[in-house]
């Protein structure tokens, strides 16, 4: 490495965040990048550790340790330190075709497995370096459209333009196959466009990449709902292969009394309405579900729940509570959660930070669930009965069960962010592919039960991270390519 003692001499530094009180005034990204010299110094913190777990992508204890894309992290960290930004960009995109997405929305599995983090408590700022590299790549022209030099004559349809779909389409196109992508929404991006709010991923970032993909020869057809508006038979007849990348979008519901009250929404529907209204009219059309002037109850403690908290605060809610079924995680790793496992520790994300700044308390209520929704005479939700939970072993299984303690809260808007139960079934039914008991499309190495129909991403593996969707797209592209050509060089 360029500076073997860098991790001892230089402190970890990340991008500056706009204060919560200021950033909630708009839906813009709120991270201010480091100066170039500061970023290069962060590259020097990468150790010559011998075994770089940061790029391993191993599964330990059922969770990923290190980057699933096997990014060449020590290489481009050192290149950042040396100021060799062009080569850093080339080495980055050698394994990750979409670093502008992962550097904004990935939870940084690489940093959790960083040896420097284990040794000093402060991992290398890998995610920040990644973002600096990719933005340099765009500004310098290092990242630009490179159409394939020749075409194979094969045609592939990709259903869904989320991260897995974009990943598989990009590689198959570069191989020379003619790729057409179908998207049921009005904009390309899937989860990236409408499932992640603008302050985490501004949508011009997606549009910038899509322009390159178009210039490279990929065709995008929006407002095309395959399985309804576009028949499966049409795609199978007109293409040599079809790849299903429709995500895991069937939300888990809360089946309790009062669920039929007005003012209760699934989180993804809420977030979609807000982002679409923002992009269409800067909210002038009044079509966004709004939390303005309302007391909001968010059910679910994951990333989507946090996004709902941040969005509701930006809309002007007057109060917010977030329910989490599980106990509060510890502040530091428990003895049974050793490095390089993913740290199961308490994390206060941007939405919770903003709630603390606005309302003086963390919005999360751990070990709770909804027992009943209350509604007024007009049928509008006006409150909820909350049950406290505890962890117990029941019939040999540990689960969260009611303690008997209950309390009521007022709420005018309820957002259900309780996870997903697999993919929406109509696309799978249209293609006649087998399903798993968990509601995902069954496969053998990404091939479904139907000839020349493949599947990847959350539609295959279930709800997951963007980085895993990109990995799935990369792996699936090689399988599809081999099926078309008899061999693959992807």
Q: Which residues does each PLM region occupy?
A:
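C-terminal catalytic lobe of FAD-dependent flavoproteins
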Residues: 12-34, 42-45, 366, 374-375, ...
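FAD-site-proximal beta/loop scaffold in flavoenzymes
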Residues: 260-293, 392-463
